[in-house]
């Protein structure tokens, strides 16, 4: 009987060991690039970002030719993990989506919110959740404390963004209550939106919360955050529809750097709340 118990115990331990090996944490395998992602072997991948979207992508203050930021660092970590050669492709934010859908850019990796409409053009790998911030001049001259108190204000929003949708929705709500509507101005890139607030042409610029907080922290005499909205939206890196190898390489790499806390370390470096990380997941529709 004792020998039977011992044998059973040994078998269970052996099976547990096999299970533990099977569930081992993912690891980087750059030497297996051609085996795992054959269409990427020998290629240099272009990573699209707007260098005026801090803290996600921005010029290094010590070296103008160097681009840094949380999304830039994530892209480097993930692509290095897979052994993929890559380079940054810099441009205005609103132009990077059509450039990616058209194949001029391989990955759009710069604070890109997921929407079903965008997923008709691009495939996503999610890694972060989002919140929206409202940037205004220091002192908040119009005393705007929420989007609901914005009737009669002028808003600057990114062209084609979820913030544009939110501003239009509130404009309609204001008018339905017989209040002045919201004047909506769209901007093609972050720098243009910031100038609208700085010059006083816009009372509020709506954009990502981390961007707003970074601008306010770096320029406290010029800007402040009027309010924030927890949106529930997810943010991801995106590729042209059907580019399965690249999509899988991004997902696999993100799983590795999330498992070993590299992503949280990058977030901490750029003062992004660690709770904004979400498990890597592919979305194609």
Stretches found by the model and what they are:
Residues 25-31, 72-81, 140, 148, ...:
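Extended ligand-binding regions for polar small-molecule ligands
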Residues 129-136, 213, 217-255, 272-285:
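Periplasmic-binding protein-like
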Residues 51-54, 64-80, 112, 133-189, ...:
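Bilobed "Venus flytrap"/periplasmic-binding protein-like clamshell domains
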Residues 76, 85-149:
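Acidic, polar ligand-binding/catalytic clefts
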Residues 25-35, 85, 162-182, 225, ...:
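Ligand-binding clefts/hinges and TM-proximal coupling segments of bilobed small-molecule sensing domains
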Residues 25-111:
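Extracytoplasmic small-molecule ligand-binding "clamshell" domains
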Residues 94-98, 111-120, 166-170, 196-231:
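A ligand-binding cleft/hinge motif common to bilobed small-molecule-binding domains
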Residues 70-72, 87-98, 142, 183-195, ...:
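Short helix-initiation/N-cap motifs at beta->coil->alpha
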């Amino acid at each position: 009987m004792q020998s039977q118990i011992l044998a059973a115990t040994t078998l269970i331990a052996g099976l547990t060991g096999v299970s533990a090996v099977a569930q081992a944490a993912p690891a980087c395998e750059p030497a297996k690039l051609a085996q795992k992602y054959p269409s990427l072997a020998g290629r240099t991948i272009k990573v699209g970002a707007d260098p005026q979207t801090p803290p996600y992508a921005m010029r290094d203050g010590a070296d103008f030719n160097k681009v840094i930021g949380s999304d830039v660092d994530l892209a480097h970590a993930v692509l290095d993990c897979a052994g993929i050669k890559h380079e940054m492709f810099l441009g205005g934010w609103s132009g990077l989506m059509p450039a990616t859908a058209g194949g001029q850019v391989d990955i759009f990796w710069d604070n890109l919110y997921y929407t079903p409409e965008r997923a008709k053009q691009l495939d996503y790998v999610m890694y972060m959740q989002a919140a929206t911030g409202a940037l205004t001049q220091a002192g908040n001259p119009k005393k705007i404390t929420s989007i609901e108190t914005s009737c009669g204000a002028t808003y600057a929003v990114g062209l084609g963004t979820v913030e544009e949708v939110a501003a239009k929705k509130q404009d309609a709500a204001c008018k339905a209550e017989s209040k002045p509507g919201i004047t909506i101005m769209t901007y093609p890139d972050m720098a243009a939106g910031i100038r609208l607030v700085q010059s006083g042409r816009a009372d509020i610029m709506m954009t990502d919360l981390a961007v707003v907080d970074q601008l306010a922290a770096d320029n406290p005499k010029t800007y402040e955050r009027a309010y924030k909205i927890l949106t529930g939206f997810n943010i991801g890196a995106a590729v042209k529809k059907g580019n399965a190898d690249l999509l899988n390489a991004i997902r696999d790499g993100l799983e590795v750097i999330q498992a070993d806390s590299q992503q949280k370390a990058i977030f901490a470096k750029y003062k992004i709340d660690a709770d904004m990380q979400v498990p890597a997941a592919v979305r194609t529709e």
